[in-house]
Structures are given as C-alpha cells and as structure tokens.
Amino acid sequence: MAHKKAGGSTKNGRDSESKRLGVKRFGGESVLAGNIIVRQRGTRFHAGDNMGIGKDHTLFALKDGKVQFDVKGPKNRKFVSIVAE
C-alpha cells in the first residue's frame, strides 16, 4: 500500500487586511462638507479650520472649500484646514 507520511504543521499563513489609511484629498483640491480628508491612526495630522475629527481620528470637512495643509507651532505639527472658495 502506498502511504504518505503526514506533513508537519506551520505557524505562518496569516495576515491582516490593509486598512486603507492615508490622505484621501490633497492640498488645493475642492471638497464638500462631509468629505473624508485623512484616515489615520492617532493624530499625525491635526484638525484646523472647518475640519472635524472622528473617534478613529479621521479628519473630515465641515464646510465646502479647498484643502490646505500647514505646519504650525513650536512642535511643527501638521494641520489640515478647509479654506472657503
């Protein structure tokens, strides 16, 4: 009788799905209120004028306008704002 010995087990073979994080609307782009601008873990980008922040730190537009990125403050923090057109 032909037999094949059982193969060993492996500890590999798992991976998590990518979360599609990052900047979704770039500087100078026109956006509508409610559009998501940045999806992030933690506050890599901070909310500036006319921006809201979700419980998962997602930044979104509160008003229609253009996206503007700035670096401000003594800690050189990155801020995202919406400038009215």
From Swiss-Prot:
GO biological process, one term: translation
GO molecular function: structural constituent of ribosome
Pfam families in the record: Ribosomal_L27
Region (Disordered): 1-22
Keywords recorded for this protein, A-Z: Ribonucleoprotein, Ribosomal protein
Source organism, top-level taxon: Bacteria
Magnesium recorded as keyword: no
Gene Ontology cellular component terms for the protein in this record: cytosolic large ribosomal subunit
Alphabetized HAMAP family for the sequence: Ribosomal_bL27
Family assignment from sequence similarity: Belongs to the bacterial ribosomal protein bL27 family.
Protein's recorded name: Large ribosomal subunit protein bL27
